[in-house]
Amino acid sequence: MAILKWKLSSNQISTTETADIQTDNDNRPPQAAAKRRRPADTTDTAQPLTKLFCADPALDNRTARTATNCTNKQRTVCSSNVAPIVHLKGESNSLKCLRYRLKPYKELYSSMSSTWHWTSDNKNSKNGIVTVTFVTEQQQQMFLGTVKIPPTVQISTGFMTL
């Protein structure tokens, strides 16, 4: 393999302007480009993993549900941070419009997702899901009693581990 180098007017060789030419005399395989080195890891590994990956409970002002006060008895394992949720299922565009109509009711929910859908769904439909999370079950019930949900939207309630 031969490399052409172009000479500049000041008799300097530019290494950025190169071209690869395959010749019959050169039977060597092409060499791989040099790999970039990753920057050194700055994570302090002396700390236990729980300190690295768990949130500081002092920063989280929401009431966390613990395994002792978990109300979902059908589950065998109950996480320490469980939130009541509502899944709103329906046509994606109507769910998007519903999300905008629910903005004045921000005090009735903790957070609301964008419209999403399951990727493994083989139905090839335009149905989507919006997930609404709450701090308490009372807040969830107040949301469902106050907000008017269109009849084309299906409502599913449950719990989500956060």
From Swiss-Prot:
Name the Gene Ontology molecular function terms of this record. DNA binding; DNA-binding transcription factor activity
Where does the signal sequence lie?
A: none
- Region: Disordered; residue ranges are 15-47
Principal localization?
host cell
Which keywords are on file for this protein?
Host nucleus
Q: Per the record, where are the segments of Polar residues compositional bias?
A: 15-24
Quote a single Gene Ontology cellular component term. Answer: host cell nucleus
The record's subcellular location field reads:
Host nucleus
One biological process term from GO is:
regulation of DNA replication
- Which Gene3D superfamilies is this protein grouped with? 3.30.70.330
> Which SUPFAM superfamilies does the annotation name?
Viral DNA-binding domain
Matches recorded under InterPro entries: E2/EBNA1_C_sf, Nucleotide-bd_a/b_plait_sf, Papillomavirus_E2_C
> What is stated as this protein's family in its record?
Belongs to the papillomaviridae E8^E2C protein family.
Q: What does this protein do?
A: Plays a role in limiting the replication of viral DNA in keratinocytes. Recruits the host NCoR/SMRT complex to viral replication foci to mediate repression of both viral replication and transcription.
Q: What is this protein called?
A: Protein E8^E2C
Task: Tell me what organism the protein belongs to.
Answer: Human papillomavirus 33
